Amino acid sequence: MVVLGLEDGVVEDICKEAQSKGKQIYAANYNCDGQIVVAGLKPDLSEFEALFKERGAKRAMLLNMSVASHCPLLKNASLELGELLESALNENFAPVISNVSAKPYTSKSEALNLLKEQLIKPVLYKQSIANSQDSVDCFVEFGASVLAGLNKKITPKPTYAISSLAEAKEFLKVVK
């Protein structure tokens, strides 16, 4: 469910309130100020949709998702992912910003822990961009420009959205 127009703390409080009643609802993606995705069991999300609106959300809308990502419902998948990553990763890393901590990591052990946690913890997207903006000249998104739109609300740094090989080649000419 995407919730628009509420502060992070209000969304978190509603999730805690739901959890205290045995419901499985979790803040899952902190996209930008006033936009949080909430994950959980669909019946639980549906039950609390109206409460988000009552507490001031401009919009609370169920998303067509096949899995409740970035929340404790994926605990078993997280453990399985850890086992697969153990043999897939090596020790050589360029710094990568973790969506779990919004900070860089550079080692295999950090990668293993943080990538497993990424399945069961919220995505700190806006915090990741805010924390990294001073060390980059621009951001590059490969895809449909969803993140470029969010970045406009988070940082003054430009974000380039690349959705084709031709766009990638053109971008590389410009940045050389």
Language model features: what each stretch is:
Residues 89-176:
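Acyltransferase/transacylase module recognition
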